[in-house]
């Protein structure tokens, strides 16, 4: 008699799944953490809601209203979730039939689009970006049949550049009546003029992902948003968990999105942008650095001579960067989160000491 293991009982696609390799999963024993695009220092909040004996609201009113005001949309166009990652998954669950429909994304880009689709049993199609990391619109057009959701990260993680707005328009026209286009704007606070939020009225099939993890310095809170037209939001509400945000999370999120919270966020953004330019200028003068790419975000992508050796050398010194070598077209590339001036100096000094 054959013995069936617990693993044998699991769905085949789950058995074959490679989980997303988050910065925390990859580990390390560093004291300079520049691998997860987090804000470098903690922001203090006081909990004001003490009614923890009661279940929270499904969509906390103060959070929704504050975010709607900040983003310039109606409250009915906002969904709050456990990070933007949950929004990625909700869109697939709401719009894609497992075994029938597909999602499409354009590597090199964020890894959770594929993980979410594969977990649910939805096909992933990829159309690599062009040499300048812009969209291959012809390639996308050729692969759209059967695609229900298209993910485009702008500014793109890990490359740091914005997608050409005219290409976004072309994509939205190509997909009208066929698929949802998701603009992942996790880093939009670092270049707010590039947001597509003003396009929602024109494109009923546009959805926008946002987060409090980056510029709002709340990666540990796990709070993100989907902005879309009311018809899309209503569908997402059918598949979201009944209580996605705990009471303390909603409490802190509402404070972060208050007028004074927004002012503080914008001050942090200005500080990070200044630090980014300092770090870019320094990296360009370092012998082991072959190329530094322009960035509209809180991280910098650079190509290194002997990048694996450089990555390990810094790792051994407690400086944890993100290796991008396995991403399409990113051979030799490492991604560096913009931290404090002290952290930037640690990186600069360590790289200058590398023998090339």
Curated annotation (Swiss-Prot):
Cofactor: pyridoxal 5'-phosphate
Enzyme class: transferase
Catalytic function, reaction form: L-histidinol phosphate + 2-oxoglutarate = 3-(imidazol-4-yl)-2-oxopropyl phosphate + L-glutamate
Enzyme Commission number(s) from the entry: 2.6.1.9
Family annotation (CDD domains): AAT_like
Keywords: Amino-acid biosynthesis, Aminotransferase, Histidine biosynthesis, Pyridoxal phosphate, Transferase
InterPro entries per record: Aminotrans_II_pyridoxalP_BS, Aminotransferase_I/II_large, HisP_aminotrans, PyrdxlP-dep_Trfase, PyrdxlP-dep_Trfase_major, PyrdxlP-dep_Trfase_small
GO MF annotation list: histidinol-phosphate transaminase activity; pyridoxal phosphate binding
N6-(pyridoxal phosphate)lysine modification, residue list: 214
Quaternary structure annotation from Swiss-Prot or TrEMBL: Homodimer.
Family membership: Belongs to the class-II pyridoxal-phosphate-dependent aminotransferase family. Histidinol-phosphate aminotransferase subfamily.
Protein name: Histidinol-phosphate aminotransferase
Organismal lineage: Bacteria, Pseudomonadati, Pseudomonadota, Gammaproteobacteria, Enterobacterales
Gene (UniProt): hisC
